[in-house]
UniProtKB/Swiss-Prot annotation:
Protein's name according to its UniProt entry: ATP synthase subunit beta 2
Gene: atpD2
Keyword RNA-binding applies: no
Keyword list, A-Z: ATP synthesis, ATP-binding, Cell inner membrane, Cell membrane, CF(1), Hydrogen ion transport, Ion transport, Membrane, Nucleotide-binding, Translocase, Transport
The organism's taxonomic lineage, starting at the top: Bacteria, Pseudomonadati, Pseudomonadota, Gammaproteobacteria, Vibrionales
Similarity field: Belongs to the ATPase alpha/beta chains family.
């Protein structure tokens, strides 16, 4: 192991000098033993020549000074993988942070790995039922697919993610890996206790690099979580990988890029934005051994879906769930936009002709209502034809029937959550669009599960 010394510290960036010809490679991990309890890890980012390497710190660089000894580990950051990680909370380096003692005898993987080759990859068209009406109907998820939850601040990304975890991870017999990338520590804490109460903690591995961590940590924590998921997949398991939030991964890359002195590109993002996103996303894939189904929350800055970060993420996904501030403002939750959300699985050959026809009819009805809104605002409902009046009435019922109470929001709403089977969802919307419930008031459709609940509620109105 070669030993170097610190020659320069600028925030999270540390320059280390090694003997000429004995310097570490790019992405190698360096260890600083400063005499305190923990040791700080650095990751090599650039070779500056003359034996000097520029590194990013994986923890706080407070207290570092020039002349401190740095030891090269000779390989990239390695993290524990396998059964021992289940039920544990780890940081970017794979160290336990849940005060439950060390992680037992373990296999370790490097966090920088190649994506599976073309021959190894497999695609699946099996559907993953979520129990959320609007998702199952409009943008169905594929087992082994990549799903993005897009939304601005405060429209419900994390609540939707938690509901999906509740409905899928608890019912799903496989394993889950939850990666918190630059999000609130409180959310990570809530998630841990929720899983514990549900009795599924022994099927979940958690990796957290939260908002207060330095950028190097937030940039690498997604890779740590993915590496743990890859190990389970390679053992032939079906894994759920939850990433909250993929935008913070991009943001950490922007910070690191600026610290390293690279020229920024559009909107101040790093010039390597597409490559960094590709390196992560291409590894999240299913092979002939096992599958990784990934659900990622994507923050949309200023509600602008054309921002380079969400726009780059779009290209990698099989299904996109777009959360709308306008729908949230109407008090319709989940605030998922059925006209903006898409899925590659919404194909008659995958979901069946009936499902496809009902989903498209729902979208056509809502689209026509959207077009008529301007006329209604100027001239009022009376100026519409009888057919359009009927369509508007049905569209408003469809909008309300797309809402449903969530299990994870029970504590706020006081209304018990519901899981709606796909066949009930299709049957309900089909009957609604065929005019079977034209005489039922629209408020009866608010926050119900299947159509039977609507009929029960209508009797009480």
């Amino acid at each position: 192991m070669s030993i170097g010394k610190i020659v320069k510290v600028i925030g999270a960036v540390v320059d280390v000098e090694f003997e000429q010809g004995k310097g570490p490679k790019v992405y190698d991990a360096l260890k600083i033993n400063d005499g305190s309890d923990g040791s700080l890890m650095l990751e090599v980012q650039q070779q500056l020549g003359g034996g000097v390497v520029r590194c990013i710190a994986m923890g706080s660089s407070d207290g570092l000074k020039r002349g401190l000894e740095v030891e090269s580990t000779g390989n990239p950051i390695t993290v524990p993988v396998g059964e021992e990680t289940l039920g544990r909370i780890m940081n970017v380096l794979g160290h336990p942070i849940d005060e439950c003692g060390p992680i037992g005898e373990q296999v370790s993987y490097e966090i920088h790995r190649d994506a599976p080759s073309y021959e190894e990859q497999s695609n699946s068209t099996a559907l993953l039922e979520t129990g959320v009406k609007v998702i199952d109907l409009i943008c169905p998820f594929a087992k082994g697919g990549k799903i993005g939850l897009f939304g601005g601040a405060g429209v419900g990304k994390t609540v939707n993610m938690m509901e999906l975890i509740n409905n899928i991870a608890k019912a799903h017999s496989g394993l889950s890996v939850f990666t918190g990338v630059g999000e609130r520590t409180r959310e990570g804490n809530d998630f841990y206790y929720e899983m514990k109460e549900a009795g599924v903690l022994d099927k979940v591995a958690m990796v957290y690099g939260q908002m207060n961590e330095p950028p190097g940590n937030r940039l690498r924590v997604a890779l740590t979580g993915l590496t743990i998921a890859e190990r389970f997949r390679d053992e032939g398991r079906d894994v759920l990988l939850f990433v909250d939030n993929i935008y913070r991964y991009t943001l950490a890359g922007t910070e690191v890029s600026a610290l390293l002195g690279r020229m920024p590109s559009a909107v101040g993002y790093q010039p390597t934005l597409a490559e960094e996103m590709g390196v992560l996303q291409e590894r999240i894939t299913s092979t002939k051994n096992g599958s990784i189904t990934s659900i990622q929350a994507v923050y949309v800055p200023a509600d602008d879906l054309t921002d380079p970060s969400p726009a780059t993420t779009f290209a990698h996904l099989d299904a996109t769930v777009v959360l709308s501030r306008n729908i949230a403002a109407l008090g319709l939750y989940p605030a998922i936009d059925p006209l903006d959300s898409t899925s590659r699985q919404l194909d008659p050959q995958v979901v069946g002709q009936e499902h496809y026809d009902v989903a498209r009819k729902v979208q056509q009805t809502l689209q026509r209502y959207k077009e008529l809104k301007d006329i209604i605002a100027i001239l009022g409902m009376d100026e519409l034809s009888e057919e359009d009046k009927r369509l508007v009435s049905r569209a408003r019922k469809v909008e309300r029937f797309l809402t449903q109470p969530y299990h994870v929001a029970e504590v706020f709403t006081g209304q018990p959550g519901v899981f709606v089977p796909l066949k009930d969802t299709i049957a309900g919307f089909k009957a609604l669009l065929d005019g079977q419930y034209d005489d039922i008031p629209e408020q009866a459709f608010m926050y119900c599960g299947n159509i039977d609940e609507v009929l029960e509620k209508a009797k009480k109105l």
